[in-house]
Swiss-Prot record:
A motif ('KMSKS' region) lies at residues 606-610. SUPFAM superfamilies: Anticodon-binding domain of a subclass of class I aminoacyl-tRNA synthetases, Nucleotidylyl transferase, ValRS/IleRS/LeuRS editing domain. One of its GO terms (biological process) is leucyl-tRNA aminoacylation. This is Leucine--tRNA ligase. ATP binds at K609. Belongs to the class-I aminoacyl-tRNA synthetase family. GO terms for cellular component: cytosol. It catalyses: tRNA(Leu) + L-leucine + ATP = L-leucyl-tRNA(Leu) + AMP + diphosphate. A motif ('HIGH' region) lies at residues 61-71. PANTHER family: LEUCINE--TRNA LIGASE, MITOCHONDRIAL, LEUCYL-TRNA SYNTHETASE. It comes from Arthrobacter sp. (strain FB24).
Length: 843
């Protein structure tokens, strides 16, 4: 597969011919320009209100080692946007930092008998040097690390504000547990029943854990996606919508009859189909829910206990699988259907989840496949209450769930489903046994982690006072410096629990003995607000400067991988909405526009050590230069598509860059020369390139901009060479070379800066300003008409855009190439599509 994108004029090839390119030295440029940029503070925003502001942000990296090919692609994309907006005259904030808390650092510390900070900050230094070499146009004065106490002080401060609003709370619940890492996982961190990070099968464990009440914001998180539509990828919005999972239906109250010494109990279920209540033939509670133990009779208790042990070993994916045979245990109890008074046997089963809905369901096997599978396994009744025109589910084994009219449903008989649902809800509400309700798949965010290298939770547990937040003036609660190596090994409880001098403190309220909370926060908490801190990272009176925050927020362009669609992006939206509700910011969405870059593959597969198909970024940079690697990443495909490194050619990019750089060497006219006196054809190409590039950049079609740039370089070289090399004196050549330098600076900043310098301009080309174009020069004097004989191209004619069909036909027939192809044959027909095509069919 070629890396050369199709343009309007065909495939743009990387130019390799031309003058001697040996004097082009990427190593010399990479050594020269970074210090100049730093001294001039080229990438530091003025931030004085004199220019319109734009905020461009790449998802900040985790310091797991040096930069890799994925970083090279993602950060090149964001850098193009930032550099383009600067050229357009905006004051651009493009900061950089590190998401530096996390489990890999802790595991590295255990392996090396060190403190996690040593590994973390050594890697940060390595990555920072690589980012600078890679010419990322970041404002380094705003650099931050989430593991710095001056950062996580404000993470803790925000946690307290959430706590005060009832949005941070603790509860006992079954949680996802990774046996290898000995820590809990949020639902979003479990993939196909396994730990997202290490791949170990996840089990369930009951723990007292901290949660953020993200469900309070479910409606807004869903509804506000409308304002992101058209600016975020549709697949990201679809993934978030499905994860939030809003379902409209009803809460229905069932009475569980008393049995033996077990009293009667009211249990509420959520259903999207209250119209099918007459079809309920049994009742199911989640086997792992406390309710199951509460309901079971003594006769069935032992069977339930054994079954619950089996369920503990199953992942959520396995429990909800449609392929597994259904299992369950009868509890010995019966639920009363509120509409018809029928008694339904109550079962405990694994296919119902304790933390979804209410942890209990009314089972309607005729119209739900999982219920039907369960009913067939345990020989329970199946009663159809919706006539869809299909065969009886009790016979076919296939539940029906389409449109239809109600049957076997008392007063609901004969109603279509759309009318039966609100009618059933009205009946329930009138008799006080149910109500309309909206349910969400989204569950509250589990944020506790039993690990060391994270933000400590700023809560003190006092025997007398209960939970006591650490006073603001005592923040940050810092991590103890003396824990390292084996002290951090997974033990099922947080390593912080072993730091007795750290744990045992005085209660801020009663001054009695108390203990710190020993869990740390999920690292996604740190990354849910970092974009706000970048606005004023040195501010000491709050998480950000209230006088500055609304000048920059929301982020205008956010760049990162689609793998963060549910986790980071959803959490960041939640945090932003809460902080907005606290009255701290005007924006209630963090990112106005989102660009998801594709993956970098090798041989059609993701790069990995196990496959042995990794490509070392450092080696590529050393061999071809930063600019060639950046340009290859951009040119290889549209930003959102994958790049297969096996199919691309950094060497071709390097040759093109040398050819572009040579243009500046060959310009002999003085700066400021009147381009209007130069070659009009070249000027037309230059101005069309400027106009087209701007339009393409505005729509993130970066690869096509590079193709247009290649065409301009070729046209400029052609003009220079047309006068036996003396064409460099043509002021139109200078104009073209300067345009090349400015546009190229977005993709290949070292080469462009060197060109700008050779052309007689002071540094930096990054602030040169986007070149203007003359509309009159966008009108082409000629267009290329393709002449085909029997479907094969035989000639190309430069003609007026206004040429008529008759004139174009005559020119085509008069062509020597066409006459040679006809070889004396007559003509059956001539098809003319002026001004671009003539197709001649011989007799």
């Amino acid at each position: 597969m070629s890396v050369q994108p199709e343009t309007e004029t065909g495939t743009a090839a990387v130019a390799t011919e031309g003058p001697e390119e040996g004097t082009y030295s990427f190593a010399a440029m990479e050594a020269k320009w970074p210090q100049v940029w730093e001294d001039l503070k080229v990438f530091t925003p003025v931030d004085d209100g004199s220019r319109e502001r734009r905020y461009v942000l790449d998802m900040f990296p985790y310091p797991s080692g040096d930069l890799h090919m994925g970083h090279a692609e993602a950060f090149a994309m964001g850098d193009v946007v930032a550099r383009y907006l600067r050229q357009k005259g905006y004051d651009v904030l493009h900061p950089i930092g590190w998401d530096s808390f996390g489990l890999p650092a802790e595991n590295a510390a255990i392996k090396r008998n060190a403190h996690p900070s040593e590994w973390t900050y050594a890697n940060i230094d390595t990555q920072a040097a690589s980012f600078k070499r890679y010419a990322i146009s970041a404002d380094w004065s705003r650099r931050l690390h989430t593991s710095d106490p001056e950062y996580y002080r404000w993470t803790q401060w925000l946690f307290k504000r959430f706590y005060e609003r009832g949005l941070a709370y603790r509860k006992d619940s079954p949680v996802n547990w990774c046996p290898k890492d000995q820590t809990v996982l949020a639902n979003e961190q479990v993939v196909n029943g396994a730990c997202e990070r290490c791949g170990t099968a996840v089990t369930k464990k009951s723990l007292n854990q901290w949660y953020f009440k993200i469900t309070d914001y479910a409606d807004r998180l869903l509804d506000d996606m409308d304002e992101l539509r058209g600016h975020w990828p549709e697949r990201v919005l679809a993934m978030q919508k499905n994860w939030i999972g809003r379902s409209e239906g009803a809460h229905v109250n069932f009475v569980i009859e008393a049995a033996g010494d077990k009293p009667a109990k009211d249990v509420t279920v959520f259903t999207t189909r209250p119209d099918t209540l007459y079809g309920a033939t049994f009742f199911v509670v989640a086997a792992d829910a406390p309710m199951a133990v509460e309901l079971v009779t003594d006769e069935h208790a032992a069977a339930l206990d054994a079954y619950r042990e089996q369920v503990k070993a199953l992942s959520e994916i396995e429990r909800q699988s449609t392929e597994r045979e259904k299992t369950g245990v009868f509890t010995g109890r019966y639920a009363v259907n509120p509409l018809n008074g029928e008694k339904l046997p109550v079962w405990a089963a694994d296919y119902v989840l304790a933390d979804y809905g209410t942890g209990a369901i009314m089972a309607v096997p005729a119209h739900d496949q999982r219920d039907l599978d369960f009913a067939r396994t345990f020989d329970l009744p199946v009663r159809a209450v919706l006539d869809t025109g299909e065969d009886d589910p009790a016979v076919t084994g296939k539940a029906t769930a389409g449109e239809g009219t109600l049957i076997n449903s008392g007063v609901l008989d004969g109603l279509p489903k759309a009318e039966a649902i609100p009618t059933a809800i009205d009946m329930l509400e009138k008799q006080g046994t149910g109500e309309k309700f909206v349910n969400f798949r989204l569950r509250d965010w589990l944020l506790s982690r039993q690990r060391f290298w994270g933000t400590p939770i700023p809560i003190i547990h006092c025997p007398a006072c209960g939970e006591v937040p650490v006073p603001d003036d005592q923040l940050p609660v810092t991590l103890p410096a003396d824990l390292r190596g084996e002290d951090l090994s997974p033990k099922g409880t947080s390593p912080l629990a072993a730091a007795e001098a750290w744990v045992n403190v005085e209660c801020p309220n009663c001054h009695g003995p108390a203990k710190r909370d020993t869990d740390t926060m999920d690292t996604f908490v740190d990354s849910s607000w970092y974009f706000l801190r970048f606005v004023s990272p040195q501010y000491t009176e709050g998480p950000f400067d209230p006088k500055k925050i609304n000048d920059w927020m929301p982020v205008g362009q956010y760049v990162g991988g689609v793998e963060h669609a549910i986790l980071h992006l959803l959490y960041a939206r939640f945090f932003t909405k809460v902080i907005h509700d606290l009255g701290m910011i005007d924006a209630d969405e963090p990112f106005s526009a989102l660009l998801n870059q594709g993956q970098v593959l090798n041989g059609g597969k993701a790069m990995s050590k196990s496959l042995g198909n990794g490509v070392d970024l450092g080696e590529q940079l050393d061999k071809y230069g930063v600019d060639a690697v950046r340009l290859t990443m951009i040119f290889a495909s549209p930003p959102e598509d994958d790049v297969d490194w096996a199919d691309v050619s950094p060497s071709g990019s390097a040759k093109f860059l040398a050819r572009a750089w040579r243009l500046a060497q060959d310009v002999s006219s003085a700066p400021g020369a009147d381009a209007a006196q130069g070659d009009r054809a070249l000027r037309s190409v230059t101005h069309r390139t400027i106009a087209d590039a701007a339009a393409l950049l505005d729509s993130n079609k970066f690869n096509v901009v590079v193709a247009k740039l290649m065409e301009l370089v070729n046209a400029t070289r052609k003009t220079i060479d047309a006068a036996s090399g003396a064409g460099g004196a043509d002021p139109a050549v200078r104009e073209a070379a300067e345009a090349v330098a400015v546009i190229l600076s977005l993709f290949a900043p070292y080469t462009a800066e060197d060109m700008w310098n050779v052309l007689g301009h002071p540094a930096s080309v990054a602030n040169a300003g986007w070149p203007s174009h003359d509309e009159a020069l966008l009108v082409q004097d000629t267009v290329t008409a393709v002449v085909q004989v029997q479907g094969k191209v035989r000639d190309r004619l430069e003609v007026s855009p206004e040429i008529g069909e008759d004139e174009l036909r005559e020119l085509a027939l008069a062509s020597e190439n066409v006459q040679r192809a006809l070889d004396g044959r007559g003509i059956r027909t001539v098809i003319v599509r002026a001004p671009k095509l003539v197709n001649i069919v011989p007799a």
